[in-house]
Design a protein with these regions (language model features):
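Glycine-rich, basic loop-to-helix element that forms the pyrophosphate-binding segment
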Residues: 64-80
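Acidic donor-binding/catalytic loop of UDP-sugar-dependent glycosyltransferases
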Residues: 49, 88-104
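Cell-envelope/extracellular polymer assembly enzymes that use nucleotide-activated donors
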Residues: 2-4, 38
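Short aromatic/hydrophobic "clamp" motif used to bind/position activated sugar donors
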Residues: 85
Length: 163
């Protein structure tokens, strides 16, 4: 089994390193199962060191000149050759536990796609209330935050990707 992690990134030099480190550490959950993982950063016409930082962290870098997140995700997915895609925003830090949950969902054989709720690093009363409301609605409606989505590659390609 091969997992392709796609990170759309526009001027993310300040946050991308932590994201890549988190993904590399969390990916051990896949390695424990004998699965492989590739990391693809889709540089979305950045003017900073985003692409160079990604390359230095051993990520494959592809480019999407039109600055739009759906296009960046689709370009990254087109370059992927994994059985499953995981889309992670460049300011997110998914951990090993989340990757282990994804692996369990994949292994169940009952899943084509899934995602995660949101937790913010910095909290405030208003911010916590907004995040809590979003997570509640997400669970009720079976929505996923765009910051972490996974799906079977064949299903993603069949529906034509993001729009």
């Amino acid at each position: 089994m091969k997992i392709s992690v796609v990170i759309p990134a526009f001027n993310e030099e300040k946050l991308l390193g932590a994201t890549l480190g988190s993904i590399q550490a969390g990916g051990a959950a896949f390695a424990d199962l004998g699965w492989t993982m590739e990391i693809i950063v889709c540089d979305n016409h950045s003017t900073d060191a985003t692409a160079a930082l990604a390359r230095a962290a051993a990520a494959r870098v592809v480019s999407e000149p039109v600055n739009q997140i759906a296009r960046a995700r689709n370009t990254g997915a087109a370059a992927a050759d994994g059985d499953w895609l995981i889309f992670v925003d460049a300011d997110s830090r998914p951990g090993r536990e989340l990757f282990a949950e994804v692996a369990a969902a994949i292994q169940s054989g009952r899943c084509l796609a899934g995602g995660s709720t949101v937790r913010m690093d910095q909290s405030s009363l208003l911010g916590d209330a907004g995040t809590g409301l979003w997570n509640l609605i997400s669970r009720m409606m079976k929505w996923s935050a765009g910051s972490f989505i996974f799906c079977q590659t064949a299903a993603f390609r069949k529906v034509g990707g993001f729009n």
